[in-house]
């Protein structure tokens, strides 16, 4: 099986890569490995939606994969998903995609600039309706995500986004990854490990090492059982 792991930064897959065997065909962004009978490429896109969409689309246009995994860290809006928890994100949306109207916010769909179900959107969200069949993936809790350019760290804006979308987690790349996969018809799964609770910015409370270790273990299990 040919598998692609997409990540924003090398640090987020630092616990996965040592479990793979380096192979030929490595570049600065797209590195090749093997595990058992699988060929595993790792694409490092850089942080944010623009970089993720651009590099994913470029690779998808010239390469074919049996499954694509997005591995990264995220912030959690739910106490039931504490740092170190790995989540299978099956729906995502771009939280800031719209316009301000005084104190109100209008989504791009509410502005009638984009249809609620205009491909690849479903009811204003990006939905992975047919994730890969994988025993390790099936064991993960499923969550709804938002993708942002500005990570939340203000109590008022956190309250507003929870009221509007009620998300489980947030990241800076997930929706762009899902958009590219849906457009290109690539089987995919977005897998994220919680590094912090979404609250007023408090780096001392973050558990990045625990999140990266948990993410690496989860991604390796998915690859191993593919």
PLM regions and their residue ranges:
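N-terminal short beta-loop-beta anion/metal-coordinating cradle
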Residues: 1-57, 63
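Short glycine-/acidic-enriched loop or helix-start segments at secondary-structure transitions
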Residues: 14-17, 78-80, 98, 157, ...
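Active-site-proximal beta-strand elements of phosphoester/diester hydrolases
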Residues: 40-45, 144-147, 191
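Structural motif
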Residues: 66-69
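Mid-sequence, gly/pro-rich, charge-dense loop/helix-turn segments that line enzyme active sites
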Residues: 77-165
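A C-terminal functional module that forms or caps the active site or interfaces directly
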Residues: 148-190, 195-199
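His/Asp/Glu-rich mid-to-C-terminal helical/loop segments that flank catalytic regions of hydrolases
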Residues: 198-226
């Amino acid at each position: 099986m040919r598998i692609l792991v997409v990540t924003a930064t090398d640090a987020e897959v630092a616990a996965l890569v040592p479990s793979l065997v380096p192979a030929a065909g490595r570049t600065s962004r797209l590195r090749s490995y093997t595990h058992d009978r699988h060929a595993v490429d790792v694409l490092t896109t850089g942080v944010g939606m623009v970089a993720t969409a651009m590099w994913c689309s470029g690779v998808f246009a010239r390469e074919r994969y049996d499954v694509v995994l997005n591995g990264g860290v995220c912030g959690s809006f739910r106490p039931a998903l504490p740092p170190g928890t790995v989540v299978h994100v099956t729906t995502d949306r771009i939280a800031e995609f719209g316009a301000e109207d005084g104190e109100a916010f209008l989504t791009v769909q509410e502005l009638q600039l984009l249809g609620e179900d205009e491909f690849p959107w479903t009811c204003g969200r990006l939905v992975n309706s047919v994730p890969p069949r994988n025993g390790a993936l099936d064991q993960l809790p499923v969550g709804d995500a938002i993708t942002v350019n500005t990570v939340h760290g203000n109590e008022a804006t956190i309250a507003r986004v929870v009221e509007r979308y009620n998300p489980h987690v947030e990241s800076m790349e997930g929706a762009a990854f899902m958009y590219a996969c849906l457009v290109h018809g690539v089987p995919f799964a977005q897998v994220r490990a919680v590094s912090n609770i979404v609250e007023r910015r408090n780096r001392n409370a973050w558990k990045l090492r625990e999140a990266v270790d948990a993410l690496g273990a989860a991604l390796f299990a998915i690859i191993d059982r593919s």
